């Protein structure tokens, strides 16, 4: 009924993690940047004449969060986390915390990204993170990773919410955590200070 649907909608959260968004849409204004030659007033005055007015909205990583909420009428707590390759994992951790803290009865956690863009490949290659040949994640000869597009969603709910619909509980998230050592994108402090 309508009342139950409203409660479901208000008590269902959405947590989305991504690597950061679609940078190719920012290419629209690169020619204008070159022409303006660091003259910000000129750049600002000509921006609306040279760039699609939706360019910024097309690049936002929280678009996925918005579309999920709108499509499924989910109005509970939500967050968009952009943190390179761990964004999806952070979304699961945040969704589980929302359930544990009583902010929601259920939450969908989503991870997505499509980082295959020239500047990202170059950036990761210069850091030595791109495999020189085949991807060999479990081989002693592995020497990096490869980019790929992907998305996954996981529906989490409290034990009480599962019981109310007669669902079998398949697993439990006991905890999760993350840290920032401010040492760089992939660096970890020798003393592991931020991890402990």
Residue ranges and their predicted role:
Residues 25-29, 92, 117-123, 183-186:
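Short acidic, glycine/serine/threonine-rich loops at helix termini
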Residues 1-72, 77, 112-118:
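Conserved beta-ketoacyl condensing-enzyme motif
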Residues 130-196:
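Condensing-enzyme catalytic core mediating Claisen C-C bond formation in acyl metabolism
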Residues 32-33, 124-128:
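Short, hinge-like loop/turn segments at secondary-structure boundaries
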């Amino acid at each position: 009924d309508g009342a139950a649907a409203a409660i479901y909608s208000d008590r269902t959260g959405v947590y989305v993690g991504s690597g950061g968004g679609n940078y190719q849409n920012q290419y629209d204004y690169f020619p204008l940047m070159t022409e303006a030659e660091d003259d910000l007033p000129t750049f600002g005055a000509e921006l609306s004449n040279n760039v699609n007015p939706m360019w910024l909205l097309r690049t936002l990583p929280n678009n996925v969060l918005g579309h999920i909420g709108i499509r499924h009428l989910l109005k509970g707590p939500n967050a968009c986390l952009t943190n390179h390759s761990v964004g999806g994992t952070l979304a699961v951790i945040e969704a589980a915390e929302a359930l544990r803290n009583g902010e929601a009865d259920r939450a969908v956690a989503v991870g997505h990204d499509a980082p295959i863009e020239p500047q990202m490949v170059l950036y990761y290659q210069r850091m030595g993170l791109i495999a020189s040949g085949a991807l060999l994640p479990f081989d002693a000869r592995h020497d990096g990773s490869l980019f790929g597009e992907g998305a996954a969603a996981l529906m989490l709910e409290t034990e009480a919410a599962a019981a109310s619909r007669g669902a079998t509980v398949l697993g439990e998230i006991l905890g999760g955590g993350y840290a920032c050592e401010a040492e760089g994108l992939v660096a970890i402090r020798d003393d592991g200070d931020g991890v402990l």
